[in-house]
Amino acid sequence: MDSLTTHPATAQQARAFTSPSSLSFPGGTAFPGGADLTPPSDKDANMATNGQSANGNVNGQQQGANAANGNGVMPATPAATPGASAPGSGIVPTLQNIVATVNLDCRLDLKTIALHARNAEYNPKRFAAVIMRIREPKTTALIFASGKMVVTGAKSEDDSKLASRKYARIIQKLGFNAKFTDFKIQNIVGSCDIKFPIRLEGLASRHHNFSSYEPELFPGLIYRMMKPKIVLLIFVSGKIVLTGAKVREEIYQAFELIYPVLSDFRKV
């Protein structure tokens, strides 16, 4: 996925993910902690896509932590305080970004595309893809010489597919034998505001197997849920970002699972 991160695993990746220039989460400017986006290396991107951090496999770290607690079994999802009621939150996260990939099934001359297409830029010394934008649906495409394309910025699955087809059509009109194959949604990002402040220190301490919190590097807590496999960025203000989903239902499910946990750590 090149410079797009789906599972930010470190404070540095989370800062890049929520930066104003981020393609992973275009709505990141609404959240604290924005920073200039520095595209991770291919290795870092692959690790992030696989839900790993630079320190190793998240699953292994968490299983090891549980074994140290004498448990030896990795819980699939977080749990609220025993006996606490878990009513529905009544909150539906808003989809902020959908990242999809497409195979145009032909080699592309990126210089030709950049010269003749509107709203296209190409700086091979900086990034090995043409960056193209369209206004409707408002999206950005990363187009590679191999014929692979990444489309980001759509707010719905239908818009993502429509935008991808429009980009493919633009490439066809430039004389390339482009096809529209292997369309696949790679990541869905959602966000919401639970409208109450959260004690992040307490959450990080109680749920250390799932959490990473380094406020001097990034103001949000990184919470790695295992089932569904979603990463949540949780801010003291009560704003939440959820990423890593393949279908929108995973965003909704993850939020309903985390909501009673966050209620346990509500600031009073």
Curated annotation (Swiss-Prot):
Instruction: Cite the source lineage.
Output: Eukaryota, Fungi, Dikarya, Ascomycota, Pezizomycotina
DNA-binding among keywords: yes
Start and end residues of the sequence repeats are 95-171, 185-262
Keyword field contains Repeat = yes
Q: Which keywords are on file for this protein?
A: DNA-binding, Nucleus, Repeat, Transcription
Q: Which Gene Ontology molecular-function terms are recorded? A: DNA binding; RNA polymerase II general transcription initiation factor activity
Q: Where is this region: Disordered?
A: 1-86
This protein is called TATA-box-binding protein
Its Gene Ontology cellular component terms are: nucleus
Spell out the family assignment given in the record's similarity comment: Belongs to the TBP family.
Q: Where is the composition biased (Low complexity)?
A: 50-86
Please give the PANTHER family that the UniProt record associates with this protein: TATA-BOX BINDING PROTEIN
Where does it mainly reside? nucleus
The record's function comment reads: General transcription factor that functions at the core of the DNA-binding multiprotein factor TFIID. Binding of TFIID to the TATA box is the initial transcriptional step of the pre-initiation complex (PIC), playing a role in the activation of eukaryotic genes transcribed by RNA polymerase II.
Q: Which InterPro entries match?
A: TBP, TBP_CS, TBP_dom_sf, TBP_eukaryotic
Listed under GO biological process in this entry are: DNA-templated transcription initiation
Describe the protein's quaternary organization and the partners it interacts with.
Belongs to the TFIID complex together with the TBP-associated factors (TAFs). Binds DNA as monomer.
Q: Which gene encodes it?
A: tbpA
Where in the cell?
Answer: Nucleus
